């Protein structure tokens, strides 16, 4: 039976804690997309480069970005989850990007109840290497060639 992720609320404690629906687990080299019509996750494609998702990737429930899709989110946690998993997470900041449709923000968040990240409240609390890794991944994962890549930048915390 298909799941109705569209009916899932943003979260009881938003904006401090929000519900994220995971499309792609950490470590995957496959890009999955949610098929709204059928209520399932489909393999969109393997990544073009020998990359993997550095953290779980999905969307924040109950949101809508300028491009008509829910807000994208990368969820930092100790372990990968799975396609379709709903994770309560705490937003930390945003990665400002552009794609063919225009602005394409990626929210960076952490698992709300992961004791390994309990002290992380803003992007400033993350190691610089983690931020660079996320930024690097986001620059490379959609484009097969360097000339197609868009610039991104990591601003201050949310």
Question: Residues of each region from the PLM?
Answer:
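Hydrophobic alpha-helical segments, chiefly the membrane-spanning helices
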Residues: 152-158
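Conserved small/polar residues in nucleotide/adenosyl-binding loops
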Residues: 141-148
């Amino acid at each position: 039976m298909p799941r109705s992720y569209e009916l899932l609320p943003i979260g009881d404690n938003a904006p401090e804690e929000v519900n994220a629906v995971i499309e792609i687990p950490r470590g995957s080299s496959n890009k999955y997309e949610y098929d709204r019509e059928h209520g399932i996750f489909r393999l969109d494609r393997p990544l073009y480069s020998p990359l993997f998702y550095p953290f779980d990737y999905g969307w924040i429930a109950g949101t809508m970005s300028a491009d008509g899709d829910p807000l994208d989110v990368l969820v930092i946690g100790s372990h990968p989850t799975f396609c379709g998993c709903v994770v309560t997470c705490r937003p930390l900041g945003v990665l400002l990007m552009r794609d063919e449709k225009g602005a394409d923000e990626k929210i960076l968040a952490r698992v709300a109840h992961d004791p390994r990240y309990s002290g992380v409240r803003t992007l400033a609390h993350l190691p610089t290497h983690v931020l660079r890794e996320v930024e690097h991944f986001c620059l490379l994962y959609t484009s097969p060639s360097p000339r197609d890549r868009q610039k991104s930048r990591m601003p201050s915390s949310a």
